[in-house]
């Protein structure tokens, strides 16, 4: 399950199990609940603050929990709507958010990164990838709007329709990430960026973000059903 650490006024949300490396950090329903609980804890803190998300080992996050999905196909629409709530939470979070992408970010994990204000990626290893086209899995209304709004149009076309794997330098060139640095500098670089923005924390920032992301937020609030999503 995810856990929190803190560096000064910056909260660091680790997406995997404490003390373990190379977890895929997939979005199991329990993981989603735990993530929301930790974000509640961060929001309850008073004073200047910012948020960094990261993980340890090979994966930032591999996205949807496919094992859970195939065991619960009848619950897939509700599960996807629950995933949307994490993206929504980050898009309107009342403090600066920075994804420290130290490993692979695939599928919904790539979307988790793009739902944050800024992204720092490892430059020498790891990929940013949307493999849905190769898995015969469509994007939900909310996911599609998130990606086409947060990426440039041609980058979205390439990423969503070809499943291209972007290494750090390519992701930087495509505007997917804001920095691509050596592996041992990813977290420090993200924390430094977040630290410079702790004074922006507050309701005004949430209002600004809601105005900026209104179309995405409305799309993420669209209920997933057979009229707009068909898997398999």
Task: Explain the meaning of each model-derived region.
Residues 38-41, 82-94:
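Catalytic-core regions built around general acid/base machinery
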Residues 1-14, 159-199, 204-220, 224-232:
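Amphipathic alpha-helical segments at domain termini/boundaries
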Residues 92-200:
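Crotonase-fold acyl-CoA enzyme core
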Residues 13, 35, 53, 65, ...:
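Terminal peptide-recognition signature
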Residues 30-34, 82, 89, 189:
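Charged catalytic carboxylate motif
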Residues 27, 54-85:
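Glycine- (often His-adjacent) and acidic-residue-rich active-site loop
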Residues 58-61, 106-107, 215:
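Short, active-site-adjacent cap segments at secondary-structure transitions
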Residues 1-54:
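Conserved CoA-thioester-binding segment of acyl-CoA-metabolizing enzymes
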């Amino acid at each position: 399950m995810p856990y929190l650490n803190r560096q000064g006024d910056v909260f660091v949300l680790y997406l995997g199990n404490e003390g373990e490396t190379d977890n895929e950090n997939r979005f199991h329903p329990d993981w989603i609940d735990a993530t929301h609980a930790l974000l509640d804890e961060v929001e309850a803190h008073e004073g200047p603050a910012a948020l960094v998300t990261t993980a340890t080992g090979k994966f930032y996050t591999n996205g949807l929990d496919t094992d859970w999905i195939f065991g619960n196909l009848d619950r897939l629409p509700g599960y996807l709507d629950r995933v949307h709530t994490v993206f929504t939470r980050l898009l309107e979070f009342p403090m600066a958010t920075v994804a420290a992408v130290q490993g692979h970010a695939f599928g919904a994990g790539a979307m988790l990164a793009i739902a944050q204000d800024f992204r720092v990626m490892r430059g020498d290893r790891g990929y940013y990838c949307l493999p849905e086209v190769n898995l015969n899995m469509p994007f939900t209304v909310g996911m599609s709007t998130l990606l086409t709004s947060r990426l440039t149009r041609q980058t979205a076309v390439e990423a969503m329709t070809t499943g291209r794997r972007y290494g750090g330098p390519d992701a930087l060139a495509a505007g997917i990430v804001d920095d691509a640095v050596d592996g041992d500098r990813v977290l420090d670089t993200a924390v430094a960026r977040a630290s410079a923005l702790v004074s922006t924390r507050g309701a005004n920032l949430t209002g600004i973000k809601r105005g900026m992301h209104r179309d995405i937020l409305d799309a993420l609030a669209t209920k997933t059903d057979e009229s707009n999503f068909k898997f398999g």
